[in-house]
Amino acid sequence: MKILVTGFDPFGDDKINPAIEAVKRLPDEIAGAQIVKLEIPTKFNVSADVVKDAIAKEKPDYVLSMGQAGGRFELTPERVAINLDDGRIQDNAGYQPLNHTIHGDGENAYFTQLPIKAMAKAIREAGVPAAVSNTAGTYVCNHIFYQVQYMRDKMFPDIKAGFMHIPFLPEQVVTRPETPALSLDDDVLGITAAIKAIVARDGKGDIETIEGKNH
């Protein structure tokens, strides 16, 4: 089994992005699965081209995209991607879409193929906070989540894909009072546990348990 794990570069006012920093620190093999790591730009459309090329080259069984969600307390596997770009800030290319449909021939939304409940449970059992999330936002995180699902729908039907958000790092909240943070070590531990759950549930679907939050 091969799993492509992507992480965004820094964006906005931050000089570091926990997503790519955690991805870079993942082992090359987890639970027997080969881990392919990829840094992607925080840019609408360009990020999708980079991931598309990597999927075509690596032919992974799974794609797990990682992104930063400042303000969240826990790692949050995402349930659904929506067909909408609505940037609260410009991306790293200076582009800020407003109420923009990502693909006119795409579904209004795509649900992940990842076992998100099993992932959240495994992360917590590893000692790291986690919960299923029902919104990936409308910035570049949702964009790449949707784009990979669209690719699966139109080009790569054999892959399974999804997205997971992680909180700020402690150094990112020094000037952000009362904002939650999680250490890089915990990020890596949590992502590793999530990937182990993906491998363990391959071909079995997700577990039946109560998960999720209002957001």
From Swiss-Prot:
Complex formation: Homotetramer.
Active site: 78, 141, 165
Domain of life: Bacteria
Keywords carried by this UniProt record: Cytoplasm, Hydrolase, Protease, Thiol protease
Protein's UniProt keywords contain Hydrolase: yes
Chain's role: Removes 5-oxoproline from various penultimate amino acid residues except L-proline.
EC number(s) reported in the record: 3.4.19.3
Name of protein: Pyrrolidone-carboxylate peptidase
Source lineage: Bacteria, Bacillati, Bacillota, Bacilli, Lactobacillales
Family in the record: Belongs to the peptidase C15 family.
Single Gene Ontology MF annotation: pyroglutamyl-peptidase activity
Annotated Gene Ontology cellular component terms: cytosol
GO biological process, one term: proteolysis
Location of the protein in the cell: Cytoplasm
Keyword Cell inner membrane among UniProt keywords: no
Organism whose genome encodes this protein: Lacticaseibacillus casei (strain BL23)
Xref: InterPro entries: Peptidase_C15 (IPR000816), Peptidase_C15-like (IPR016125), Peptidase_C15-like_sf (IPR036440), PGP-I_bact-type (IPR029762), PGPEP1_Cys_AS (IPR033694), PGPEP1_Glu_AS (IPR033693)
Catalytic activity, reaction form: Release of an N-terminal pyroglutamyl group from a polypeptide, the second amino acid generally not being Pro
Xref: Pfam families: Peptidase_C15
Gene3D superfamilies xref list: Peptidase C15, pyroglutamyl peptidase I-like (3.40.630.20)
